[in-house]
Regions:
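Contiguous, often N-terminal, cationic amphipathic patches that form binding interfaces
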Residues: 1-44, 48-52, 63, 67-73, ...
Length: 98
């Protein structure tokens, strides 16, 4: 059975000390985002490419399985992931809450 696309809200900090998935942060209104840090600058799509590479590595999927659906020029992005919902949910639940 092929994977369905899963969406993931992320908050990206570019020009960071290292590439990492920091954890999940939730606002008072209940919206949650996965917080990411990438070393790449937000210049000519470099940070966006780093985000896709980081998420692919964290989830164990190919870089081509991660795309930016919304927010290419924003810190707040919506990613589309070609992964099963169950695998994504297990990964997400294991992330620290920050």
């Amino acid at each position: 059975m092929p994977n369905a696309c899963v969406t993931c809200a992320v908050h990206v900090t570019p020009k960071s000390g290292k590439d990492q998935v920091v954890g999940v942060s939730c606002a008072d209104d209940g919206t949650c985002e996965v917080r990411l840090r990438v070393t790449a600058p937000p210049d000519n799509g470099k940070a966006n490419k780093a985000v896709c590479k980081l998420m692919a590595g964290a989830l164990g999927i190919s870089k081509g399985s991660v795309s930016i659906k919304r927010g290419k020029t924003s810190h707040h992005k919506m990613l589309e992931l070609d992964i099963s919902q169950a695998i994504y949910d297990a990964w997400y639940e294991a992330l620290p809450r920050v």
